[in-house]
């Protein structure tokens, strides 16, 4: 609902809706799910002489935010609401109101919520573990496809897992509320979802209220379905768009129905396939609504806010407009609504009580763990201890950190009462496309003058391989620098404080030599294979120190240049120390935080190396945002401190942040140093991915001898660029220039700090 579905998602949606329609046409289906218990809907004001009044709030995505002003009008007129049933967005608004939230609170929540962030499951980079942060350097992204041991190929059921959406529902309804019957809420409530296996409506009348809301809003192909009591549930709008039958089954004698569904379009022969698919899905949802509305009697009322095409299903950023339209509809319906007034006029101004349940003291913690992670590992993310009060805010933050494992479809908790005691039940479910997750990536550098590097990457992540979260990854790279590598990462404790990593494989790199005018005159190809191993001490998700060793063998040959230069074989063996301080929000468009890397590499003959030398590497970056503006500062210092580094160990420079007036990897040397300052302006942000324009000033150089390094020998570089953090990687178009040379145009994909 947060975004306009893609063509593939529309096809999935229409297929699901069609399947549902084949089995859900009969009206009594929803009523059959909930017993016609007229005691659910009782006169809350004690006035048994009047009829019981129920609300049926229809689905419609962002259009459903107009429900709030309808509710506010009922309060103003003093119309009692005895029970509520809601579908999709109607379940969102209805559940908040039924749980005791005032209309002012609900309105404030929908106006202040960052809906783009809510519908973006990605955990902010600064909150991820160091392991997940390090994956940014692999330039790989999960594509929603994987391999399962029981079913072969697995495909993610939706684009979004709805983690932040569920957290919003928990905050909105009171996370500390003990699960139970929805009849026990301040206003009895029902949420309507759809059984994915039958297409029939499922009326949820007990359990976790936030999970009921989440199930009712599980739009097919957009959100992952929800598992509840043996059923897999989708959005309720698929089967019961306006739950009039449900609120009637609760015992309502007079019904106020609110229809916020999207009307059918008027198409002609030029209609696109996307428009046709929209129309097909519209047939099903509007048909469901029409069948429900036909059951209304002369004492009932339907209100249709005139949303037209001004507020679409995914237009959550238009909350203020939806509220305004809802107010107009409520005002227009006022004469008809007056027939629902039974209380004295003075009662109309009495505010509704807003019971806020206190965070309960926890007596027990249960976990239903469907993953291969250890129970204790998952619980270590959640600050819940028997004998202490539940901290709902900390629980929500811990759940979001647990999603940082990258392999969970859901991790939820429910406050339950057992044997007179209150406790927490945690349920963890793995992604359906695991435990072998397919990944893909693309890196590109092109100066539009014939110098380009392109690498296509495909990987498989196997996770978890141990209760503590061991992982393995195999990566195949094709293109300018082909390779086949593998890694095994093994934590030794729950907190991932101590871990080991073993990497190995084959890699090929090119080293280019350019003349003074920037034309390539030579290119060397370096092929190497070998293995490295490290032990890490992780102090937090920000700081890590590692020690290790590496052993490689390979060869260097000329691809462009003097054919008389013979191929040379080499042997590499070194011990290494690395330290990382990583608290930056992005490696590609940094706006806040710091990043520092330090490394020592000692090549030794007793490790099998041809040459003995030592290298010191240090990089530091910082970024700070001011609204849409951000500034960046950085410096790098890399030297061969002793000995002579061979060709395979020299440094490469060129490109944005690395002397942008040079082509990618144009500069080579055994030593280099640079400083830079940058500025970016965020043009837009969509589902956590931003489009930015900016520029850099850079000063530095590369040298063959350390004695030649001199501040006055640096070269001033500058660049301006525009970029977008796309789903295939950060794509950047820019112009780089340096003193004493012509400007170059560059295109980069997947290049970062």
Predicted regions and their residues:
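Acidic/histidine-enriched alpha-helical segments
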Residues: 265-267, 338-355, 551-552, 593-596, ...
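A generic beta-sheet turn/junction motif
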Residues: 197, 371, 417-419, 624-628, ...
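Patatin-like phospholipase
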Residues: 2, 11, 29-85, 95-400, ...
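C-terminal segment of classical bacterial N-terminal signal peptides
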Residues: 20-29
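Solvent-exposed coil/turn segments that connect beta secondary-structure elements
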Residues: 102, 111, 194-197, 207-209, ...
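C-terminal outer-membrane beta-barrel translocator/porin domains of Gram-negative envelope proteins
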Residues: 410, 423-425, 435-447, 474, ...
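Gly/Ala-rich beta-loop-alpha elbow adjacent to hydrolase catalytic centers
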Residues: 86, 90
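Gram-negative/organellar outer-membrane beta-barrel architecture
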Residues: 393, 398, 410-576, 651-657, ...
């Amino acid at each position: 609902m947060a975004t306009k579905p893609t063509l593939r998602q529309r096809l999935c949606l229409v297929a699901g809706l069609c399947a549902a329609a084949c089995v859900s046409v009969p009206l009594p289906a929803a009523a059959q799910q909930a017993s016609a218990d007229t005691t659910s809907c009782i006169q809350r004001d004690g006035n048994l002489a009047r009829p019981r009044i129920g609300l049926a709030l229809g689905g419609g995505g962002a259009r459903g935010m107009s429900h709030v002003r309808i509710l506010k009008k009922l309060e103003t007129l003093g119309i009692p609401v005895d029970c509520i049933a809601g579908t999709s967005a109607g379940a969102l608004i209805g559940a908040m109101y039924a749980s005791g939230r005032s209309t002012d609170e609900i309105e404030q929540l929908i106006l202040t919520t960052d809906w783009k962030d809510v519908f973006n499951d990605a955990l902010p980079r600064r909150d991820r573990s160091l392991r997940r942060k390090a994956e940014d350097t692999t330039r790989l992204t999960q594509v929603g496809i994987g391999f399962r041991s029981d079913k072969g190929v697995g495909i993610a059921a939706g684009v979004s897992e709805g983690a932040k959406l569920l957290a919003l529902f928990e905050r909105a309804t009171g996370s500390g509320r003990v699960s139970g019957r929805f009849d026990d809420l301040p206003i009895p409530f029902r949420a309507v979802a759809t059984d994915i296996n039958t297409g029939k409506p499922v009326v949820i009348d007990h359990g976790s209220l936030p999970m009921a809301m989440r199930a009712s809003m599980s739009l097919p192909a957009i959100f992952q379905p929800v598992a509840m009591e043996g059923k897999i549930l989708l959005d309720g709008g698929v089967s019961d768009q306006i739950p009039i039958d449900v609120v009637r089954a609760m015992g309502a004698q007079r019904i106020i129905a609110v229809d916020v569904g999207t009307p059918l379009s008027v198409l002609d022969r030029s209609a696109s396939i996307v428009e046709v698919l929209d129309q097909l899905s519209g047939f099903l949802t509007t048909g469901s609504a029409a069948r429900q509305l036909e059951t209304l009697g002369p004492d009932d009322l339907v209100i249709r806010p005139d949303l037209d095409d001004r507020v679409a299903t995914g237009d959550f950023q238009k909350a203020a407009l939806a509220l305004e339209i809802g107010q107009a509809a409520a005002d227009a319906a006022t004469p008809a609504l007056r027939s629902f007034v039974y209380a004295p006029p003075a009662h109309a101004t009495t505010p509704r009580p807003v019971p806020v349940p206190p965070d309960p003291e926890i007596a027990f913690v249960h976990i239903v763990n469907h993953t291969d992670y250890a129970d204790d590992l998952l619980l270590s993310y959640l600050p819940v201890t028997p004998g202490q009060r539940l901290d709902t805010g900390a629980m929500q933050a811990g759940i979001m950190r647990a999603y940082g494992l990258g392999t969970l479809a859901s991790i939820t908790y429910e406050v339950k009462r057992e044997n007179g005691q209150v406790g927490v039940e945690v349920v963890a479910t793995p992604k359906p496309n695991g435990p072998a997750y397919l990944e893909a990536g693309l890196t590109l550098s092109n100066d539009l003058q014939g110098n380009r590097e392109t690498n296509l990457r495909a990987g498989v992540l196997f996770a978890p391989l141990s209760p503590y979260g061991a992982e393995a990854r195999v990566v195949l790279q094709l293109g300018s620098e082909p390779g086949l590598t593998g890694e095994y990462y093994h934590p030794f404790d729950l907190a991932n404080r101590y871990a080991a990593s073993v990497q190995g494989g084959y890699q090929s790199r090119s080293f280019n030599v350019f003349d003074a005018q920037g034309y390539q005159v030579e290119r060397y190809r370096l092929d190497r294979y070998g293995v490295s191993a490290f032990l890490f001490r992780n102090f937090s998700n920000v700081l890590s120190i590692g020690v290790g060793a590496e052993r490689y063998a390979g060869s260097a040959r000329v691809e462009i240049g003097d054919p008389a230069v013979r191929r040379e074989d080499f042997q590499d063996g070194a011990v290494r120390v690395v330290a990382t301080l990583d608290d930056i929000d992005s490696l590609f468009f940094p706006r806040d935080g710091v990043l520092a890397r330090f490394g020592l590499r000692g090549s030794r003959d007793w490790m099998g190396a041809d040459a003995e030398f030592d290298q010191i590497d240090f990089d530091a970056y910082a970024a700070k945002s001011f609204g849409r503006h951000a500034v960046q500062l950085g410096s790098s210092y890399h030297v061969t401190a002793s000995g002579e580094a061979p060709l395979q160990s020299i440094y490469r420079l060129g490109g944005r942040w690395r002397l942008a007036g040079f082509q990618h990897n144009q500069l080579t040397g055994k030593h280099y140093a640079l400083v830079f300052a940058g500025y970016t302006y965020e043009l837009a942000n969509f589902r956590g991915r931003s489009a930015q324009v900016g520029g850099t000033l850079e000063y530095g150089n590369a040298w063959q001898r350390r004695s030649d390094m001199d501040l006055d020998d640096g070269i001033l570089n500058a660049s301006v660029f525009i970029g977008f953090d796309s789903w295939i990687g950060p794509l950047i178009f820019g112009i780089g220039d340096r003193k004493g040379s012509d400007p170059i145009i560059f295109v980069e994909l997947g290049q970062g700090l």
